[in-house]
Every structure is written in structure tokens, then in C-alpha cells.
Amino acid sequence: MPRDFPLDRVRNIGIAAHIDAGKTTTTERILFYSGVVHKIGEVHDGAAVTDWMAQERERGITITAAAISTAWNDHRINIIDTPGHVDFTIEVERSMRVLDGVIAVFCAVGGVQPQSETVWRQADRYSVPRMVFVNKMDRTGADFLKVYGQIVDRLKAKAAPIQLPIGAEGDLSGIIDLVANKAYIYKNDLGTDIEEAEIPADMADEAAEWRAKLMESVAENDEELIEKFLETGELTEAELKKGIRDGVLKHGLVPMLCGSAFKNKGVQLVLDAVVDYLPAPIDVPPIQGVLADGSEAVRPSDDNAPFSALAFKVMADPYGKLTFVRMYSGVLSKGSYVMNSTKDVKERISRLVVLKADDREEVDQLRAGDLGAVLGLKNTTTGDTLCDPDNSIVLETLFIPEPVISVAVEPKTKGDMEKLSKALTSLSEEDPTFRVSTDEETGQTVIAGMGELHLEILVDRMLREFKVEANIGAPQVSYRETIRSSSKGEGKFARQTGGKGQYGHVVIEMEPGEPGTGFEFINKIVGGAVPKEFIKPAEMGMKETCESGVIAGFPLIDVKCTMVDGSYHDVDSSEMAFKIAGSMAFKDGVKKCNPVLLEPMMKVEVEVPEDFLGSIIGDLSSRRGQVEGQSIDDGISKVSAKVPLAEMFGYATQLRSMTQGRGIFSMEFSRYEEVPRNVAEAIISKNQGNS
């Protein structure tokens, strides 16, 4: 089956931004103008095509990354609409991993928000070329150039406006195209009657000034163009387009566009810019991976190369499990067998589909550069590599953040027990930041996630999709333990009960590890003080104790254990005895190494009318928060602070009552920090009382 679009005419793009910047509305308009939908759907009406979960349509927010294919100007455009709420960061993370380019949407009034910075960092992590669409230019307080300044200052981006708005707020009537040096005037509400015109006389000087700045920015990235620009002070439209595209691909330029998706202004120009400036799969570096022998290799974006793809999302579906894949090389055919090289198992490809939100089109093949979904995979989860069984490779996987909040969950009736187990398994397969575990002390099922809204939506889905009624406990913070100094630890387990006894003896040196290393074990036993077969059980004993904690029952992180000595008995020693001795040595060492409790600190940003600033700062301080910055803009105060997650439960309700419903806030995980001694003592005694 031949390609319907050559690779250089394929664009895999994401639409990403902070909550309420208008990403989903922008996607809706793109689908309308490119002919995928024939009626415009609004987020606030609960009719958006890409918001296809019941919860998304009710809440007016996008939770999961919906993948949709469309076409524009003879190009195939595969779009992923990502959520802007910080609790759903994994959805943005996994879409960034598989995209070639991003449209970052900003609100012309709100500008750069905390979540915009998070999304920008994620795009940086995966080196994704991007362009900016400043949306909501029709809103009161809209200011395109103010947002430009914020993007340069706060995101340190090499932004370059390639458009200017004609009018703003209620008077937005058109857009100046600085590349073509002309204006587009919108003649009807649907945005389908557009007149090409001269730049309005009252904006000619401003447009000339910004066009000169654009030519300078473009020329800086290209030696030939800079020579011509210095000689003539002018670049042609074709030179500008080529220069902007080269700058975007080299991460040296971020073109900025403007408009109002809701008012149907500027969206077709965004599509033109996607085609003109964002990369095709062949324009980005080939994907890297590791071969079976451990050596590094690359897979070019080519139908003739060996097949390789990355599973970036798993979704429960009425027709079975859908696994979304990004094709990097080769061809994937329906009915074929492939290798999951991450798990070293073979999988059969039952069916292949291309998605248009909750509508789907079955296809016989997916090719290099495609985004599609596979039905029938049994063992594949998010981040796994699928490849040609004869040309095995493991591709770079995803960064998956650790959950910061947990709640106990139990079925309301015994009959729901099995359904609950099924629901939790299915939801954790879909979402790698959603973890399920069993509390060994209480036997309770504990679910963990990225925030209150994240868990609320998942519990809601259990009820709607799996018909499971469950009781939910109070949220619990995911504390961690660590050590601050070094010491030796010793564990000796000896038991004689007639006949064969038990004997294991372990001596370790314990010290703080590098941040992010978790548990690290080094074996330095020499001279056979402990036989080789007992080293691994001793390590396992330490590791299990590390996972269950020592001072308050929370996992220990960043600890390095070196096994230096021990002893054994020819008859009585066993793997179990050394596992227990390893655990005893670990506990002994931790107690001597100045153990401390760590808690998740959240980066909190609050926006309130100026009159409420004093009470907001006072309230944050009472929550053990540290205010790190504040600014006032147009009567709105912005406060940024670091606050322990433990103090933030119920903050949304409190903020509403303090500001008469006029305050908003966002919160995302920052890092783990030591809990103050008086607070730690209360947590430790409470947890020791529970155990």
C-alpha cells in the first residue's frame, strides 16, 4: 500500500499550553477549517471533538492527549491536543516525546503562566522545535507585545513576531503578515471570508519596524542571509520563509503568531505556519536506541529501514485495549508479529487504526512518521519499544514523574472487590503516574497520583466506566526518608531451635547517595567472609527495608550501602537468614546516620486582585510557605511561593472564600525538602502508632 503523503509533507505536532489558554478551541478550529468536522464544537458547551471523555466534557478541561489526523495544503497533519492542568503532566510529557513540533498557545491577557513554563521545559527536554500562537486577542486586556516580552524574559526564548494584530479586544479586525508584508482583514464571523489588503496606514511604521527586527533575527541564523541583509537591508518573502524554517529547526528562532480561535481569526494562518515552519519527521535527528549487544544505534525516518515504534499511551476502549504508537522507522502491517524489546516478548498486531478523536479509521499499515493505534497488544505498556524481531532495538523511553499524593480506596460492597481490582489494573496500564499498592500493615488498597484532581478524575472514571462504587480515604502525602551522615550498620540473625538453625551476619557502611539515585548497593566482600550466594539475599533484605522505611514507614531515598564484612555457618546459613540479617544491618545503620523525613514541596502561584494580597501572603505563611516573589500588573497581584503539599489540601475552597471567588492558583511539584523537626516528630509518632 503506497503512502498517501510523502514523508516531507507529514507534520506530527502538539498543541500545548497552560489551562484556559484555548488549546482545545484552537484544535477545534483547525479541524473545522481543514474539513475534519463540519460544525464548530465549543469546550464550554461540552462539544469539543478532542475532549471525548465524559469528565473532560463536563469540566471543560482536556485530561488525556487525543490524537487526530487532518490535512492542509497537501500536507498530512497529525495533532495531539494536550492537557494544561499540572495534575496531567504525564500526558504532556508523553506527547512531547513523540512529536516533531509544537504550537505553544498563550492567552493574550494572562501571558506566561506557571504551567506554560512547565510545558516549555518539557519541550526543551525533548528538543522539540516550536512556534507560538497568542490566542484570545479579542479579550479585554489582550496585549500581544506584552506576551512577547514575557516569553523572552521568563522563558528565555528567541521569540520573533511574524504577525501583528490589527486592533485588539473587541476591535480585532485582522492580522498583519510581516513575512508577506500584507494584511488579512476578516469579513465574516466564521472566518471564511478573508480579504488580502495593504497594511493599514496608521500601522505602517510599526509594521516596518517589526519587519526589520524579524529580518535581523532571521539573518542571525544564516551567514548568506546576514551578508545580504547588511548590504541591502532587505530580504525577500522566500528568503524570510526559508530563514524562519531553518531557525525553527535549529532551535534558534520561535515564530510568534496571534489571533482569536474563539472568534475564528488567525487559525488558517497557524495552519500555513505549521506547513511552512515546523519540521517533517525527516527534518529531526533520527531516533536513538540501544541494540541487543548494548551498542548505540539510530533508526532513520524511512519506510525501508527496520521497523521501530514507541508505545506512548495505552487506553481502555469499548473494543479492547488501544495502544498508541509513534512510528519511527519501517512499516507495521496488520496481522504481523513484532518484538516488544523492552520486555523481550513477541506481540501480534490484530488491527491498526488512525484516530479522529472518538471516531476511527481502520488501516492495513502504519509507516515511518505516522501516529496511530494498535489493537490486540497484551503485554505492551507506556514507554515500551516495538520493533522488527530480526533487528531488535530499545528506543529512548519517557521520563515518568513520581506521584506525590495517595488515598486509600475500598469497594462499598464485597461484590465490587473484583471489579475494583480490574478497574485499577486497567487505569494504571493507561497512566504510568497512577500507582496501585497494598498497605501491608492494614491490607488496604492505596492509589497514588499527581494531585487531588488527578485522583478525583480516576475515581470518577472507576464509577462511570467500570461501575465500581468505592469509599475513598483522606488524601495522604507521599513522604520520603533519607539519611544525612555516614556510619556502619551490623545485623546478626542467629536462631537455634533444635536440628538445623538459622545464621546470617552482615556488616555494611552506609552513606548518603547522590540525589535521585534511590537505593545503591555495592559489594566489597573479600576473602569469602560471606559466600557469593548469600550476597544477593542480603541486598534484597536491605532493599525491601529501604522501600518500607525505618523511622516512619516511608520509602528511603538516596542511600548508598556497601557490604564490607560478615560471617556465615556451613550448616545453618541460608538465603532467608542473610535476607533478615541484611534488613537488620540496614535498620541499624539508618538509626546511626541522622535519619530525616522529607516532604514534597509545591511551586504555588496565586493570582488575586490587589486588595487581597495581604491576606493571601499571611495565609501562605501560616501554611509553612516561603514567598519567593510577587508582582502587580493591572491591579492583579501574582504571588509565587514554595509550600509543603501537606498544607495545601482544601486550598482551592479557602482561596475562593478569602477572595470572594476572584482568586486563582496553580500548583506543581518542585522537589523534596526536609520536614521541620517539630512537624516530623508528629508525623513519625502518628505513623509508629499506626504500625
From Swiss-Prot:
Q: Where in the cell is it found?
A: Cytoplasm
Any one GO MF term held by the record is: translation elongation factor activity
**Swiss-Prot/TrEMBL GO biological process terms:** ribosome disassembly
Indicate the segments forming the tr-type G domain, all copies.
8-282
Which terms are listed as keywords in the entry? Cytoplasm, Elongation factor, GTP-binding, Nucleotide-binding, Protein biosynthesis
Q: Give me the residues that bind GTP, please.
A: 17-24, 81-85, 135-138
Family annotation (Gene3D superfamilies): 3.30.230.10, 3.30.70.240, Elongation Factor G (Translational Gtpase), domain 3 (3.30.70.870), P-loop containing nucleotide triphosphate hydrolases (3.40.50.300), Translation factors (2.40.30.10)
Q: Which GO terms describe its cellular component?
A: cytoplasm
Xref: PROSITE patterns = G_TR_1, G_TR_2
Q: Which SMART domains does the entry mention?
A: EFG_C, EFG_IV
Q: Which domain of life is it from?
A: Bacteria
Matching InterPro entries, A to Z? EFG_II, EFG_III, EFG_III/V, EFG_IV, EFG_V, EFG_V-like, EFTu-like_2, G_TR_CS
The entry assigns this protein to a family as follows: Belongs to the TRAFAC class translation factor GTPase superfamily. Classic translation factor GTPase family. EF-G/EF-2 subfamily.
UniProt cross-references to HAMAP family, sorted A to Z: EF_G_EF_2_B
The role this protein plays is: Catalyzes the GTP-dependent ribosomal translocation step during translation elongation. During this step, the ribosome changes from the pre-translocational (PRE) to the post-translocational (POST) state as the newly formed A-site-bound peptidyl-tRNA and P-site-bound deacylated tRNA move to the P and E sites, respectively. Catalyzes the coordinated movement of the two tRNA molecules, the mRNA and conformational changes in the ribosome.
Name of the protein described by the UniProt record:
Elongation factor G
Q: Which organism is it from?
A: Synechococcus sp. (strain RCC307)
Q: Which gene specifies this protein's sequence?
A: fusA
